[in-house]
Structure formats: structure tokens, C-alpha cells
Amino acid sequence: MVSVSEIRKPQRAEGPATILAIGTANPANCVEQSTYPDFYFKITNSEHKTVLKEKFQRMCDKSMIKRRYMYLTEEILKENPSLCEYMAPSLDARQDMVVVEVPRLGKEAAVKAIKEWGQPKSKITHLIFCTTSGVDMPGADYQLTKLLGLRPYVKRYMMYQQGCFAGGTVLRLAKDLAENNKGARVLVVCSEVTAVTFRGPSDTHLDSLVGQALFGDGAAALIVGSDPVPEIEKPIFEMVWTAQTIAPDSEGAIDGHLREQGLTFHLLKDVPGIVSKNIDKALVEAFKPLGISDYNSIFWIAHPGGPAILDQVEQKLGLKPEKMRATREVLSEYGNMSSACVLFILDQMRKKSTQDGLNTTGEGLEWGVLFGFGPGLTIETVVLHSVAI
């Protein structure tokens, strides 16, 4: 008689979960941040709100964002005026857009990742799809399976309404799947479209304006698996350890509510303070077993919720300015793309490390950390091990 342990052992991979490929995609419509307040107040018929517009201009100027990419063009917004009002019932119009655009943008990123991976898509065993943009059944995971022509028995996991921390969540789940299913190859896709959150300005809901100044559209895809096939699969980063925690005394810090008016966000002013207060504990838990206490000796991939969060984390930990370089570059070029952001930063870091002639994918360093922050206030932590270039 065979024991349970004898059955389980050959089902598990030998090595750690490894990121084997990364692909990214954005809508064609590029929006320059410097002129966005003029466009935003004009398209929402709010040009008479001059004081509010000046406030929004200051938000955009301080955002450290140069440009963003958005599915919503001037033409689409003119055809859907309910999206341009502050709280007009508009969920049907928003849903009609995102249930098509979210999987379409996800496919664009996935095709790039699969091409870099170099293996046939028939070898994909699992699919994780994550979006905060719209809900449907069957979900975006099903739609992507059809769009890519994946096998019908691919094991799918659909994550809706997680928010900005979810780039860490999908990595945590992919790690568990890859390491506990020998030979598994997991396609991970995060796709975010701001059509679900766009709305006109209001004097009484300034935290909504913060979102209008920060959020952009984008999709990122990864292939994750353990025990890479030599000379065919090329490791980029290894995932060594993961954790998720709810920051104490943070209830209501970041909330999102899906209503007839779309997805509305509420933020407390102290979100940067809450993140910076709790990040040290997360780092100790993650890196004490490795004997690492100098956080300037590791590479950093942090969700760029906004410049204030990055500034306070740098100050709290005494980080050198270059530690957040990849994060700030992605924020500058794309804005806050919610769950997709940290995956864009992974891509940016490995490419820049190669361009700069460094000897590892992690800016020449061996160990690194990936952080996701979002509703809850929830913090995701992933310890990464770089790969020699």
C-alpha cells in the first residue's frame, strides 16, 4: 500500500518558484500629465470650478508622473457623458467597456511573456488573472483562456477587487502553485483599466481627485515555474518567501466601493504614514532569517501608490535615493496601474540591470524585496533572489 507522503513527494517541485518571462502592455492613448488638468476639467464640463482646477493642477504637478496611458479617449468620453459627471449612474456603460478591454489588454501582455518564455502555450498548466476593473461571469480568466487559445483544462484562478497590493498577491499564489505542482507553468496576468473609476471632480470628495491624478491603465504578464528547463527557460528572479498582513489600526485607510456610479475610492491622509510605520516590521520578518538588516544592500520593488509613500518609506528606513529608482521611473512613465505596477517594475529592473552591464537582474545585488500596498490596509511582501546575467 502506498502512503500519502509517497504520493505527495513526486508532486512537488525541487527548486524555488522562478519568474521565467515578463510582458507588459498599455492602451495606445497616451496622456501627458502637464496638460491633463486642462483636458480633465474640459471633458467633464467643470471649467467653471477654477479653484478646484488649480488644486488638481497642483496634485498633478506634485505627482512625479510625466505621462499615463488610458483606454478612455476624448471620443469615448463624449459618447458616454455619464462617466464625466461626478456621481451619475454609469455602471452599465463602464462594465461594457472593461469586460472587453481588461482581457484584451491582458492578452497583449501575455503574448509578449509567452514569446519571451520560448515554450509552446500548451505547456501552461495554470492561469491567475487579477483585475480591479469590473466583474463578470464567466470571468476575465475565461475570456483570456479563449483569446489565447489555451487548453480548456488549464486550472484558472480569478482575483477581482483586490486593489493595489495584488501584484504581490498573484506572486504569492503563483509561488505556491509552482512549488507544489511539479512541472507547473503558471501564466500570471494583472490587467487594470481606469474606465471603472473615472469621474468628474467634486469639492466634497478630494480623495477621488487624487485617484484621477495618479491612476493609469496597463497589463503585465509573467510565466512562473520551478526547476527551469536548461538552455530553454531563462530565469529572471527566484521567489524565496512571501507574506501578507493587515496593518494594525488601519481600517478605512483605503476603501473602494462598487456602486451604480462605478468604483469609488476613499483614502485617509495618513496612508503614507501607516505604510512607513509598518514596513520595518515586515522587513525584519522577511530578512532576519537571511541575516540581512541593511536595507540599502538589497534591491527594491515597491508599489508606487504615490510619491508621498515612497518619500516616507525612504526617510523611515534611511534608504539611498537610487533604491527606489526603478519604482519612480515606472511611476513617472505610466502612473499608478494598481496591481500591474510591481510587475512593470520587475521588468524595468531586469532590463536596466542588463543595459547597465550589472552582473545580476537585481541591480547587481543578490537579494531584494517586493512590496504591495492597498485596501485594508494590506501589505504584501515577497523576498526575491536575483539571477546572474
From Swiss-Prot:
The keyword Glycosyltransferase does not apply. Keywords: Acyltransferase, Flavonoid biosynthesis, Transferase. It holds the Pfam family Chal_sti_synt_C. SUPFAM superfamilies: Thiolase-like. Pathway: Secondary metabolite biosynthesis; flavonoid biosynthesis. Signal peptide: none annotated. Its EC number is 2.3.1.74. It catalyses: (E)-4-coumaroyl-CoA + 3 malonyl-CoA + 3 H(+) = 2',4,4',6'-tetrahydroxychalcone + 3 CO2 + 4 CoA. The active site is at C164. CDD domains: CHS_like (cd00831). It is an enzyme of class 2 (transferase). One of its GO terms (biological process) is polyketide biosynthetic process. It comes from the Eukaryota. One of its GO terms (molecular function) is naringenin-chalcone synthase activity. The primary product of this enzyme is 4,2',4',6'-tetrahydroxychalcone (also termed naringenin-chalcone or chalcone) which can under specific conditions spontaneously isomerize into naringenin. Belongs to the thiolase-like superfamily. Chalcone/stilbene synthases family. This is Chalcone synthase 1. The gene is CHS1.
